From Swiss-Prot:
Record keywords: Carbohydrate metabolism, Cytoplasm, Isomerase, Magnesium, Metal-binding, Xylose metabolism
Gene behind this protein: xylA
Protein's recorded name: Xylose isomerase
Cofactor(s) the record lists: Mg(2+)
EC number: 5.3.1.5
Record-linked HAMAP family: Xylose_isom_A
Entries under PANTHER family matching the protein: PTHR48408, XYLOSE ISOMERASE (PTHR48408:SF1)
Record-listed Mg(2+) 2 binding positions: 267, 270, 306, 308
Record note on cofactor: Binds 2 magnesium ions per subunit.
Subcellular location: Cytoplasm
Enzyme active site: 100, 103
Source species taxonomy: Bacteria, Pseudomonadati, Pseudomonadota, Betaproteobacteria, Burkholderiales
Catalytic activity, as annotated: alpha-D-xylose = alpha-D-xylulofuranose
Binding site for Mg(2+) 1: 231, 267, 295, 338
Amino acid sequence: MSYFEHIPEIRYEGPQSDNPLAYRHYDKSKKVLGKTLEEHLRIAVCYWHTFVWPGVDIFGQGTFRRPWQQAGDAMERAQQKADSAFEFFSKLGTPYYTFHDTDVSPEGSNLKEYSENFLRITDYLARKQESTGIKLLWGTANLFSHPRYAAGAATSPDPEVFAFAATQVRHALDATQRLGGDNYVLWGGREGYDTLLNTDLVRERDQLARFLHMVVDHAHKIGFKGSLLIEPKPQEPTKHQYDYDVATVHGFLLQHGLDKEIRVNIEANHATLAGHSFHHEIATAYALGIFGSVDANRGDPQNGWDTDQFPNSVEELTLAFYEILKHGGFTTGGMNFDSKVRRQSVDPEDLFYGHIGAIDNLALAVERAAVLIENDRLDQFKRQRYSGWDAEFGRKISSGDYSLSALAEEAMARGLNPQHASGHQELMENIVNQAIYSGR
């Protein structure tokens, strides 16, 4: 008997349905702005929260009793986990998945065992993909869970740890290539510090840059055509991480000549931990030319940590998709659910409830964002607000025709006395709410 045998395939039944195992808004074939919802969203389910996390927290042991988490041969359990995962993906109707190397494969007791196990499970995953049509959105390596990475991986004070991490990334990138992954993600879970008292900032930043250059070189060597992505996060588990937010990552990439090679994978909960909105981080990534992909989730505003809950705010998601759709949508990226059910949600159905609700919210957000784009009221106001910069005087300033003193003289000659014009923030907010709640 399979773990999800009693659960039917999840289908679209419309907004009037009371069936908790059905989509109310996600009609994957519905076209919005010329693409289907499936094409817009490129939904992925993550391996780690859905099939690896045992339901632990810092005060208690695991509450889940998944069959693949029980005692037995490690490789057999890995294959059982893959069987259950692909059954879940298939029944949910999601086209992509994501993983860390140690999510899918037993780590073993040394690098030789790690490599052999990972190669075997990569072949197994390839067969599962072929039989189901499900694809890999991105792969990555877990460089934060093992005690060897307590002081970081690329930023470790021990070069042997750096080399071990490089070996994992080499194999994870090779596996991603073998499985046709569209992206490879680098999340620096412990690439930061707990205290500056024992940290050499210059050395650690240089080490991280060297590591990233090695990853880029290997990607080119093996002919990887996907995108390389860094996932920003300000802190947790370390006090401060070097990939703090989108702007910080861009500055680091620019400093080290990597800005044309690596983009960002933006997680909603990481954005709020950094003191930003999800909307801000996506807009900033587009402004800097490094937008890549999204990890869809949310945090609890009353907690100061990464709770990785399923996204349930259509308002927040609408503004995120307003930016994404305005810039042409995803290319290699997609919406990966870096989300987990709560520790008390122990039934197999709960895994479906969490994803179904979140997918419906994403579908609604795409449709509402499309309304904002089609009515063009936000952009119309922006164009009018900045119209002075498109006139001759503004163009001459922007193009560098004036020096500081020349511009000051021009201002004096014109007798300039500009007055403030309303920013109409309240009107803009009303326009957004009208699109969300009235659909127009």
